[in-house]
């Protein structure tokens, strides 16, 4: 038997018992006699765990695919499949994308707006995030459009516009208390990823470096290896090694196609308000408003999250 937990998280203020019962029914019906329900646990008014056992041996990805109809049929509830083992809650490394994940914006689009090339950059970004364009090539195309931009005041102006996603500071604080290492791996730029790292008190950051000429202008190029999907995956493994963390105890959170390799490498992966293709390919999707909801996926209750015990 294989043990799993199905976490149901409502987008609204409440998760009705009728909805939980319906999802449990759909789980058993979609899996014939392979699945048995072993009980539920209320995490909050918005979230509930459904514990199941599956006959035989099956991995998370295959069970998620088997339950695709259940997952996709509830637009106002995220249905997340996790392995019910010690690593579900005992995460020791969380790796985050930056743009549209830790922060609401895409930094390169903010710079593009400053440079008057917003439309061109946005179109390339969309294609890259939907996995329709190689990330390295898309980055080169976008950065090239920024050539000649004076950076003396640009960096400070952009930093002032960055808005941290709701729930991120609280999530980071909670995870740090649980002795979890936190990192940001960004296909964006170190000039801003480093700033976000410092703002949130993260342990590590890696991103691309914009090249600046002797006149203080962007050259339209980056320096060093590009941080793409493969780089994120390899860096996640390196961080596991550096921090002595089992890969099973790691988690990747992101919204773009270039986050998928690291999600597949990590012990678990979360597509945060991601593009449809990314949601489908990722281990799970979370489309709520606050990133503290990730703690429900780990099995924490509101009492534990908000220290009400």
UniProtKB/Swiss-Prot annotation:
The active site is at 97 (nucleophile), 99 (proton donor). It catalyses: O-phospho-L-serine + H2O = L-serine + phosphate; O-phospho-D-serine + H2O = D-serine + phosphate. One of its GO terms (molecular function) is magnesium ion binding. Its EC number is 3.1.3.3. It is an enzyme of class 3 (hydrolase). Substrate binds at residues 106, 142, 186-187, 232, 258. GO terms for cellular component: cytoplasm; nucleus. InterPro entries: HAD-like_SerB, HAD-like_sf, HAD_sf, PSP. It comes from the Eukaryota. Mg(2+) binds at residues 97, 99, 255. Keywords: Amino-acid biosynthesis, Hydrolase, Magnesium, Metal-binding, Serine biosynthesis. Pathway: Amino-acid biosynthesis; L-serine biosynthesis; L-serine from 3-phospho-D-glycerate: step 3/3. Binds 1 Mg(2+) ion per subunit. Its cofactor is Mg(2+). One of its GO terms (biological process) is L-serine biosynthetic process. NCBIfam families: HAD-SF-IB, serB. Present with 13800 molecules/cell in log phase SD medium. Belongs to the HAD-like hydrolase superfamily. SerB family. This is Phosphoserine phosphatase. The lineage of its organism: Eukaryota, Fungi, Dikarya, Ascomycota, Saccharomycotina.
């Amino acid at each position: 038997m294989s043990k799993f937990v199905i976490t149901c998280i409502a987008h609204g203020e409440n998760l009705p018992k009728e909805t939980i019962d319906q999802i449990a029914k759909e789980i058993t019906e979609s899996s014939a006699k392979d699945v048995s329900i072993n009980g539920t646990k209320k995490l909050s008014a918005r979230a509930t765990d459904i514990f199941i056992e599956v006959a035989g041996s099956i991995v998370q990805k295959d069970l998620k695919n088997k339950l695709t109809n259940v997952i996709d049929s509830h637009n106002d509830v995220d249905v997340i499949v996790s392995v019910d083992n010690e690593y579900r809650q005992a995460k020791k490394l969380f790796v985050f994308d930056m743009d549209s994940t830790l922060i609401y914006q895409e930094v390169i689009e903010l710079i593009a707006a400053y440079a008057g090339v917003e439309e061109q950059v946005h179109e390339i970004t969309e294609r890259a995030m939907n996995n329709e364009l190689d990330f390295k090539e898309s980055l080169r195309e976008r950065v090239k459009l920024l050539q000649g931009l004076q950076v003396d005041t640009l960096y400070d102006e952009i930093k002032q516009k960055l808005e941290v996603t709701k729930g991120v500071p609280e999530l980071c604080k909670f995870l740090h208390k649980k002795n979890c290492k936190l990192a940001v791996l960004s296909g964006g730029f170190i000039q801003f990823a480093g700033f976000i790292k410092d703002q949130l008190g993260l342990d590590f950051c890696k991103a691309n470096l914009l090249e600046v000429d002797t006149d203080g202008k962007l050259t339209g190029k980056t320096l060093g290896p590009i941080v793409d999907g493969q780089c994120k995956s390899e860096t996640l493994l390196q961080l596991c090694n550096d921090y002595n963390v089992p890969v099973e105890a790691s988690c990747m959170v992101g919204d773009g196609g270039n986050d998928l390799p690291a999600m597949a490498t990590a012990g678990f992966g979360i597509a945060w308000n991601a593009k449809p293709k990314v949601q489908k390919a990722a281990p799970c999707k979370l489309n709520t408003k606050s990133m503290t909801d990730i703690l429900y996926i780990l099995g924490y209750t509101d009492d534990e999250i908000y220290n009400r015990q």
